[in-house]
Amino acid sequence: MIFVTLEHILTHISFSIISVVIIIQLMTFFVHEIPALSDSLEKGMIATFLSITGLLIIRWIYSGHFPLSNLYESLMFLSWSFAIIHMIPKIWNHKNKNYLSAITIPSAIFTQAFATSGLSTEMHESGILVPALRSHWLMMHVSMMLLSYAALLVGSLFSIALLVITFRKNGKLVVENQNLLIGSSFFDQMDYLNFNENINVLENPSFSSSFKNYYKYQLVERLDYWSSRVISIGFSFLTIGILSGAVWANEAWGSYWNWDPKETWAFITWTIYAIYSHTRTTKNGQGANSAIVASIGFFIIWICYFGVNLLGIGLHSYGSFILS
């Protein structure tokens, strides 16, 4: 009973903290960036990560198995994965971490909100594992797949943002909000201009067009950079996850590959991002061309993760779920 109580407490703590974090992020997005708030944002994400980590450990202890046996647990692990990805630039001391936080923080809160409020209460309970899941491969295979989903989703969202900006007909690029352009935590600092001169420069018609085109180019370059880096990490995790799943399938079902719906869509997902990786190596593959492939992959992942579960058929049918 005490474990269940602790789990509920940590669930509410993590969701409350990340809710405050996203409010802080919106404040720094629409208003001029405040260093103290940015520091609080980072501390909040660390606290969220620790809370979800504690929640998963407690659930592991009282259930007796790694907490990845149903959709609720996988969603909480996915939210934890978004927090991990968010902290990678901080670990590497990367100066442009604000780009990543603009994707990871909303992803983490929406995932956790759906896990806690969108699923039936029965899905929150940790039941007895079906025989096929009673294996040491559970931790390896499922954790790698979920880490890959998190990284690939984040990278694909960068690509979608890149396409929106690239093909936007009006080149205003949210210039109406001067604070957003000058000091936004999402679009980064414009270090090559003196802050006191920014407003006058933007109001100069002769400079405005070239300035916005240059800024648009810089923004697209940043989005392309982050998209390729995060997707490369996710693709590595996906490859490891599929290979470990094949070994596990051979132990459980006597065959490395059975082409059931989950395996088929996992293979389609891997193929899409393999095409993305290949496209990046071609002469004109960077930028919008590879971003189109990654954007397709974004929807393929959701089909693989959620869509197949809705069918409730195949060797992975124990992953089906009921909405509340």
From Swiss-Prot:
Per the annotation, which location comes first and is thus the protein's main one?
A: plastid
| InterPro entries (alphabetical) | Cyt_c_assembly (IPR002541), Cyt_c_biogenesis_CcsA (IPR017562), Cyt_c_biogenesis_CcsA/CcmC (IPR045062)
Q: What is this protein called?
A: Cytochrome c biogenesis protein CcsA
Which Pfam families does this entry report, sorted A to Z? Cytochrom_C_asm
Give the stretches traversing the membrane.
17-37, 44-64, 68-88, 99-119, 145-165, 230-250, 264-278, 291-311
Q: Give the HAMAP family listed for this entry.
A: CytC_CcsA
Similarity comment: Belongs to the CcmF/CycK/Ccl1/NrfE/CcsA family.
State the GO CC annotations: chloroplast thylakoid membrane; plasma membrane
Tell me the PANTHER family matching this sequence. CYTOCHROME B_B6 PROTEIN-RELATED, HEME EXPORTER PROTEIN C
Compartments, as annotated in UniProt? Plastid, Chloroplast thylakoid membrane
Native organism is Lemna minor
Give yes or no: UniProt keyword Plastid: yes
According to the record's subunit comment, the protein's assembly and interactions are: May interact with Ccs1.
Q: What lineage does the source organism belong to?
A: Eukaryota, Viridiplantae, Streptophyta, Embryophyta, Tracheophyta
Q: Name one GO biological process term.
A: cytochrome complex assembly
> Which pairs of Cys residues are joined through disulfide bonds in the record?
none
